[in-house]
Every structure is written in C-alpha cells, then in structure tokens.
C-alpha cells in the first residue's frame, strides 16, 4: 500500500534531494567550508565595471574604438601609473598600442632600431598596467580571461610579488626568454587585449545597432566575441529581426532605409541579398522618372555612391510604394493595432495629384504611380508579388543575417533589470497625462512590464515558430508593429509620417508627435512609478535608455528627473551629431558610482593608429558613493549569498549525519 506524503514531507523530500545533488559537488565539510570562504571573499571585492552604450546606428569605427579604449578609462589608468615617469607623447603611444596592438606593432617594427630594448620596456609597462586593471578581480576570474597560449606565464607575472633578488631575476628571465624565442609580439597583443577586457566587466547595448550606418555587421561580430554583453532591442534592430523572420513589410522597410542612405553594400555584399530583381523592376517602371523625393542621402566623399544615385533613387521609390501596399495586409488583419490612419494610398486624388489629411488638402510633389491602380490602390501587381517573394527569400536564406539575428535573440530582450537599473531602448507607453497605456493583444489587455514581456515573447514566436502557424504569423505582425505602432515601447510616437515626408513638401505634415513618456520624463514621480512597476526601489534605482538624441549643444541634459533617468543617445550616428553637438555617450557604473562620458567626433581608425589620435572624452560624475560598492551589492552578489546560505545548510546536514561525508 502506497503511503502518501503530506505537503511538508514532500517539500522536505525535495529539499533533501537538492542537498544530495549539492553534496556531489561538495562531498565533505572541508570542501563546502572552503567554498563558503571563497564566496564570502568575493562578496567583499569591488563590483565590476559596467559600460552602457546606445544608438550605435551601424557606426562601427567609433564603437570599436570606444570598446578598445574603455571610453577613455585605459588612458586614465596609464596616466595614474606613469604620469610622473612618462611624457605625454609616450603615454599616447602606449595607449594606442593597447587599443590597436597588431597595427601599432607593425609600425614600431619598421621604425624601432633596437627592438629588443623596446620590447623589454614595453612588456614591463604592459604587465604593470595589466596588474593594476585586474587587481579588483579574483585570480579565478582573471585566469578565465587569460589567453590559452600565455595563461601560465601571465598569471605568474601578474600575481607574484617580486621583492627579493631571486624573484627579480626570475621575472626578468621570463621577459628575456619571451623576447629571445620571438614571441614578444604575440605576448604584447595578448596583454593588450587582456587590459581591454579587464576594463569592462559587463557591456550593455541599449538598442539600435542597426540603422543608416555602414557596418552594423561588424558591430555584431564584435559583440559575438565579447566576454559579457546584453542587448535591449531598438526599433531598427527589430526591423531587421522582422526582415530575417520573413515579415514582408519589414523587408520593404529595411530596403527603403538602405536605399535612402545608399547603404546597399551591407545588404548585397555582406548579407548576400540579391537586389537585381528590385533594380530590374525599378528600371522598368521608373526609367524616365527623376524620383527627386527619393534621391539617396550619399556622402560627399563617396564618388562610387554618387554614380549610382539615379538607379538607387528608382529602387528607393519602387520599394517605398511596395511598402505602403504591403502594410495594408497587416493593418486589415489586425484591427487591434489601430493603424487604419496610416492607409493613405486610397486617400489620394490621382487626377488632381492631391491628398486630404486631417481636413487639409495637400499637393503631392510626385504624382507618378505606374504600379498603382487608383480603383484598387493596395493591390499588388503580379510583378510586385514575385518581387517581394524573391526579396523575402533572400533575407530568410541569408546565413550571415540569420546568424546575427539569432545572436540578437540570444543576448537581447525588450528590457533588463540589472544591478538596480532598468534598461530599455525607447519608452514605457504612457498617455499625455502620464497614465500607463494598455494594448489589447489576443483578447487580453497588457500594459507596462507585462506589455514589454508579451512583446518579447511574441517577437520570439514570430522568428522561431513553425512557418505557417498562427503563432508565427501573429508574432511576425507584432514585429512590424514594434517598428511603427503607437503603443510600441520601441517607437514612442503616435504615428510614423513616412508617406508625408516623401510626398508632401509642407513640413507641418511631417510632424510625428511623441507619446506622453517623452513629455513627462523630467518628472521624478513618473520615473518612480515606472521603477515600481518593474519591481525596483525608486530610492536606489534609475532608468537608463536611449532612442531620442540628447541635444547637448542646446543645453539639454542627459540626466533627467533628478537623476532617476539617464538618456545616453548622444549621437554615435554622424547624422545626429549636428543636433547633439557631441558624438555619443558612455555611461560607466563602477564601484565608486556613475560617470557619464561624452565623446567628441572620431575621425577614423587609421588616424588613431598613424597619428595616435584618441577620441576626446569628457567625464561627468553623476553619482559618487561614499562607500565603494562591492559584489555583495550586485545581482551576482545576491546569487552568491543564496549559494552561501545553501552551503551553510549543507554543513549542518553533514554535522547531523543526515548525509554522509565522502573524504
């Protein structure tokens, strides 16, 4: 006869089962005690340094440089160590070597006459910097970061104290041997990369890796190799994610933006997407159309792009019209999206070349619509249907794009709570009075935290679910909605005036009203309300986001609501630097507090290497702690405290003889 256990007995049984598993890892009192001591020691170390970046918009050169120079921290560490013993020119050279070791070494090898002496001096300096940068981490953590080829040697050099003559000789012998056997170059590269890694413990990318910049792929490749990173998706990221999932409207939007900024090398050369069908279609229907409103924004110093302007303009117009047609499919299918107001092709008077919007009649600046039937303006022609199918096929079957988007899903999310900070790219949907805006999704109302979590899960369904399933179709529609919808936390505006910006000259029609979040984000009580919604304590938490460039040159502060919100979109994208007056922000959160670093314009990687020009950065202390924050004060610290509690309970179980020790 089976004896049923009551609830308490069941819980005790589960608990004992857990401790038996834990006992396999720590089979006796000695090992469990050692681990408790180790974990307690870790709790008292200074917290690791976090760096926050947002709105990179494909500008890979300044992004990679900021990672390499630790937003100016690497040079400050060198100055702290060598300000009294090195000239400023030597400090600049040493910093450049750490940022770009391979390239700088090639130059040094051509110019330096006594290379062995240079190697010896440089290796000693790099070891000292490396020791300084890694001093707040455990040996175990540093060991995991070491390059395999030099792990033992670097560990010896970092952690041994060379006080006696014998130890000094031992130290010098290691350095001399590295030089004698021809491994100094590789060792310098390894040390430089280790220094870069030790400067940043955790990297947060708060959205918009993609947009108009030339090489978001390089940014993602860099992040894929990074030791510790998370991503909060931006609206442009979601657009590419939707395109990779096969969302027709997202594909059209991605190509519209790519043609608008003549950034087709990314699409064709990097992601291998065949644009010949679009070019052929555009030439057929717009051969004699100057497409003046669709002339791409090309760089003045890019003659190749200028030569292709005529063709790209035609492609730009063709894909834009196709986008407007495709959007009707989703808008009709999802009335809960409330986007009927964006259906404008049927509002055009094709004979007069006008459109009435909000009671105002506007003259269109372009009335050539060869693929539109005025009686059925949203109907795709047979050629358009074939074209979009080919384009979607190319996106869905681009191996590199799929690899990048899978990475965005694996490391990304709609929001993140990390060490008492709330990270998201755009906004929390609010009305003009500051009330939370809800959205009906699949028959249920969602708002605030639940809304973002629902959008997150639906986006994943849109990408990962089986093709043709209801789950995938709905998720795909949501991915497009997140790009353009009025309750999208990634968009933050009441409408997207894409049609108006192309076809109406009157700029009043171009206005895109921001949601209540942006009108009220300076209010401390609004930030407190949002933080509480996400289960955070407003007295010690803050919101960190991007999306809207901070117009610093006009006196706007990135610090809002008495420090409760920090907006870090400072203009990595060159297009926004005229608005912001700077070239990006990095927020640094270390054991001493918060620092906001504003960056000046970055010329080029080549100039950084050849002329040793660094990004000029200005640091503003946002919050300084009287007592240094330790690991105990972090999310990891909370996890470690749970482990310590469990291990102490395991000790008690051993001492009571409930589980036998294995010695």
Curated annotation (Swiss-Prot):
It catalyses: beta-D-fructose 1,6-bisphosphate + H2O = beta-D-fructose 6-phosphate + phosphate. Gene3D superfamilies: 3.60.21.10. GO terms for molecular function: fructose 1,6-bisphosphate 1-phosphatase activity. Keywords: Carbohydrate metabolism, Hydrolase, Manganese. Pfam families: FBPase_2. Its EC number is 3.1.3.11. Pathway: Carbohydrate biosynthesis; gluconeogenesis. Its cofactor is Mn(2+). It is an enzyme of class 3 (hydrolase). The keyword Calcium does not apply. One of its GO terms (biological process) is gluconeogenesis. Belongs to the FBPase class 3 family. This is Fructose-1,6-bisphosphatase class 3. It comes from Clostridium botulinum (strain Eklund 17B / Type B).
């Amino acid at each position: 006869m089976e004896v049923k256990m009551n609830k308490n007995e069941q819980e005790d049984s589960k608990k004992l089962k857990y401790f038996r598993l834990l006992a396999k890892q720590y089979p006796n009192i000695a090992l469990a005690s050692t681990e408790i001591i180790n974990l307690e020691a870790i709790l008292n170390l200074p917290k690791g340094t976090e760096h926050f970046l947002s709105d990179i918009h494909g500008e890979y050169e300044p992004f990679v440089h900021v990672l390499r120079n630790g937003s100016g921290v690497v040079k400050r560490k060198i100055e702290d160590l060598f300000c009294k013993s090195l000239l400023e020119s030597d400090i600049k050279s040493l910093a450049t070597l750490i940022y770009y070791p391979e390239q700088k070494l090639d130059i040094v090898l051509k110019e330096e006459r006594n290379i062995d002496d240079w190697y010896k001096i440089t290796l000693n300096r790099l070891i000292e910097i490396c020791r300084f940068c890694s001093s707040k981490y455990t040996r175990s953590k540093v060991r995991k970061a070491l390059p395999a080829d030099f792990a033992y040697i670097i560990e010896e050099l970092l952690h041994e104290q060379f006080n006696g003559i014998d130890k000094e000789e031992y130290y010098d012998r290691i350095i001399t041997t590295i030089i004698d056997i021809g491994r100094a170059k590789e060792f310098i590269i390894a040390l430089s990369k280790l220094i870069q890694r030790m400067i940043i413990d955790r990297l947060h990318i708060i959205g918009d890796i993609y947009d108009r910049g030339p090489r978001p792929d390089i940014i993602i490749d860099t992040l894929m190799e990074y030791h510790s990173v998370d991503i909060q998706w931006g609206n442009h990221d979601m657009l590419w994610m939707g395109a990779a999932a096969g969302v027709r409207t997202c594909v059209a939007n991605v190509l519209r933006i790519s043609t608008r900024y003549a950034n087709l090398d990314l699409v064709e050369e990097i992601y291998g997407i065949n644009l010949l069908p679009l070019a052929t279609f555009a030439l057929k229907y717009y051969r004699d159309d100057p497409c003046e409103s669709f002339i791409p924004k090309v760089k003045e110093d890019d003659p190749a792009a200028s030569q292709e302007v005529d063709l790209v303009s035609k492609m730009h117009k063709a894909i834009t019209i196709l986008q407007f047609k495709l959007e009707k499919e989703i808008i009709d299918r999802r009335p809960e999206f409330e986007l009927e107001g964006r259906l404008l092709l049927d509002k055009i008077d094709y004979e007069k070349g006008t459109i009435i919007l909000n009671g105002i009649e506007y003259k269109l600046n372009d009335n050539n619509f060869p693929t539109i039937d005025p009686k059925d303006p949203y109907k795709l022609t047979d050629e358009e249907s074939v074209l979009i199918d080919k384009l979607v096929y190319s996106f869905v079957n681009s191996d590199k794009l799929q690899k990048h988007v899978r990475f965005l899903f694996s490391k990304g999310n709609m929001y993140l709570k990390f060490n008492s900070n709330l990270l998201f790219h755009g906004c929390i949907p609010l009305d003009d009075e500051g009330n939370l805006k809800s959205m009906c999704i699949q028959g249920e109302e969602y708002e605030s935290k639940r809304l973002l979590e629902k959008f997150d899960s639906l986006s994943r369904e849109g990408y990962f679910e089986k093709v043709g399933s209801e789950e995938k179709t709905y998720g795909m529609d949501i991915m497009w909605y997140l790009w353009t919808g009025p309750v999208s936390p990634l968009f933050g505006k009441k409408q997207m005036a894409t049609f108006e910006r192309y076809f109406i000259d009157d700029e009043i029609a171009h206005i895109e009203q921001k949601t209540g979040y942006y009108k009220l984000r300076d209010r401390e009580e609004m930030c407190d309300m949002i933080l509480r919604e996400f289960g955070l304590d407003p007295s010690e938490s803050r919101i960190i986001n991007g999306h809207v460039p901070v117009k610093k040159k006009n006196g706007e502060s990135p610090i809002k609501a008495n420090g409760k919100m920090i907006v870090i979109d400072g203009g990595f994208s060159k297009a926004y630097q005229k608005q912001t007056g700077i070239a990006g922000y990095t927020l640094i959160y270390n054991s001493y507090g918060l620092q906001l670093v504003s960056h000046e314009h970055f010329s080029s990687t080549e100039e950084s290497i050849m002329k040793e020009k660094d990004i000029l950065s200005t640091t503003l202390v946002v919050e300084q702690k009287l007592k240094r924050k330790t690991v105990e004060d972090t999310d990891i610290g909370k996890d470690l405290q749970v482990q310590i509690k469990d291990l102490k309970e395991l000790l008690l179980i051993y001492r009571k003889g409930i589980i036998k020790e294995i010695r």
